[in-house]
């Protein structure tokens, strides 16, 4: 099938290249001429394991192309996916849908023959209705069906998630079966591998995405609050998480205590769901609390580091390892590291950071951050070493080397990737999350 992907950002690029790898002819469209030029040269604007190889192989096969010419791409398409950004609207937390609606107008003006227009971006309930209204207002003669098909990709594992999904949710309204047939064909390689296609209404599909992300965010926030309680009563949050996670009704995923959730999805999607519910006079109190607790969590982690370092860090050097919101990505959006570093700086410390992939973005987002080339350069003459993001390369640190270069051998482990006895034998003081120290 001929597919156009509007938006060559994270979701659009990963989805487009995976569709091409399925054998479809895919054109990724973006208004950013610099981005398109770079992609044509094989320069990938984001870090995602395996993405560069997959782009190169599908470009070489002729199945994947990049352009800023939306008109030509849309006119030749069977399916057009809208995968543009939906950031939180400045000031009120609602999702900013201006890019989605602008894309809908441009798509409408260039449709030729029957076309399925799909919202792949995460959008509030009812957005598909407005996209359809815009298309029909712009081009009353258009033979089009608007479909919702939310993405469920985890940054750092997006290709695996796309090719081996737990489910594929497709929201289709009306009695015209053509869109259902088209979407089944688009996902045929996965359907043949028995990945379940969940067909539902458009509005239900849109809500599934928000409800799923909100539930996972609540699960993270729950275990973080349990971790705080563990510290007060002398319990171990990792054992608590294992003990409840083995219950099949609960499951073990997203029960890892830490500095709070961040990234491009959970913060904005929980906030957007809260606003949608308030607009319909049906507040979601659990999600409201999740948002508030998580915001405070990030700042509290800064205070935890300060307390571990003796309560006064004025003039101290603090080294932080891991700046992205999670491992295996260069995404700094709403990363807990931002709030932690700012809290340390506000308390008078000089902060030096290292991240395997996030340094370029960190420089843009964290003013006054000193940047190191590796963990040991970051730790030189440091009064404390803080692990914020659990990159694999931080799981086997040379503590003897660290001790020889640090001013004070103190490790504050905000991801619980070490045990106290492991680091104490090297002469380090150790603080972690939700465990007896």
Swiss-Prot record:
Q: Which residues bind NAD(+)?
A: 11, 30, 35, 86, 122, 155, 268, 333
Instruction: Provide the alphabetized UniProt keywords.
Output: Capsule biogenesis/degradation, NAD, Oxidoreductase
Q: In which pathway does it act?
A: Nucleotide-sugar biosynthesis; UDP-alpha-D-glucuronate biosynthesis; UDP-alpha-D-glucuronate from UDP-alpha-D-glucose: step 1/1; Capsule biogenesis; capsule polysaccharide biosynthesis
According to its UniProt entry, the protein's GO biological process terms are: capsule polysaccharide biosynthetic process; UDP-glucuronate biosynthetic process
Q: Which family does it belong to?
A: Belongs to the UDP-glucose/GDP-mannose dehydrogenase family.
* Domain of life, source organism: Bacteria
Q: Which GO molecular function terms does the record list?
A: NAD binding; UDP-glucose 6-dehydrogenase activity
Active site (UniProt): 265
Positions of transmembrane segments: none
Q: What is this protein called?
A: UDP-glucose 6-dehydrogenase
The broad enzyme category this protein falls into is oxidoreductase
Report which reactions are catalysed by this protein. UDP-alpha-D-glucose + 2 NAD(+) + H2O = UDP-alpha-D-glucuronate + 2 NADH + 3 H(+)
Query: Which residues bind substrate per the record?
Result: 151-155, 209, 213, 254-258, 262, 326
């Amino acid at each position: 099938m001929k597919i156009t992907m509007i938006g060559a950002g994270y979701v659009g690029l990963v989805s487009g290249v995976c569709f091409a790898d399925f054998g479809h002819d895919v054109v990724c469209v973006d208004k950013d001429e610099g981005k398109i030029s770079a992609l044509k040269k094989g320069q990938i604007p984001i870090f995602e394991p395996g993405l560069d190889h997959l782009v190169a192989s599908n470009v070489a096969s002729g199945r994947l192309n990049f352009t800023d010419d939306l008109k030509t791409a849309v006119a030749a398409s069977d399916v057009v996916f809208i995968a543009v950004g939906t950031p939180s609207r400045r000031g009120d937390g609602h999702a900013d849908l201006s890019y989605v609606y602008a894309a809908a107008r441009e798509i409408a003006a260039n449709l030729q023959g029957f076309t399925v227009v799909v919202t792949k971006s995460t959008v509030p309930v009812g957005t598909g209705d407005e996209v359809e209204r815009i298309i029909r207002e712009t081009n009353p003669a258009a033979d089009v069906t608007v479909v919702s098909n939310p993405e469920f990709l985890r940054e750092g594992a997006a290709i695996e998630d796309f090719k081996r999904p737990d489910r594929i949710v497709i929201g289709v309204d009306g009695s015209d079966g053509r869109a259902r047939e088209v979407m089944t064909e688009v996902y045929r390689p996965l359907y043949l591998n028995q990945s379940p296609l969940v067909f539902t209404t458009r509005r239900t599909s849109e809500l599934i995405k928000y409800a799923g992300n909100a539930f996972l965010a609540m699960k993270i926030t729950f275990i973080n609050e349990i971790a705080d309680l563990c510290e007060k009563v002398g319990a171990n949050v990792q054992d608590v998480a294992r003990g409840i996670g083995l219950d099949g009704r609960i499951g073990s995923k997203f029960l890892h205590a830490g500095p709070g959730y961040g990234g491009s999805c959970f913060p904005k999607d929980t906030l957007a769901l809260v606003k949608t519910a308030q607009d319909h006079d049906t507040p979601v109190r659990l999600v409201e609390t999740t948002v508030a607790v998580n915001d405070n969590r990030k700042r509290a982690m800064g205070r935890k580091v300060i307390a571990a370092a003796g309560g006064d860090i004025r003039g101290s050097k603090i080294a932080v390892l891991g700046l992205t919101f999670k491992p295996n990505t260069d995404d700094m959006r709403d990363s807990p590291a931002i709030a932690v570093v700012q809290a340390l700086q506000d308390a008078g410390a000089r902060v030096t950071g290292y991240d395997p992939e996030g340094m370029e973005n960190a420089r843009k987002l964290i003013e006054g951050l000193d940047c190191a080339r590796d963990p040991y350069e970051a730790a030189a003459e440091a009064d404390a070493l803080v692990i914020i993001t659990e990159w694999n390369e931080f799981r086997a640190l040379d503590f003897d080397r660290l001790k020889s270069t640090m001013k004070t051998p103190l490790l504050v482990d905000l991801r619980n990737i070490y045990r106290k006895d492991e680091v104490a034998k090297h002469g380090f003081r150790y603080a972690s999350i939700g465990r007896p120290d």
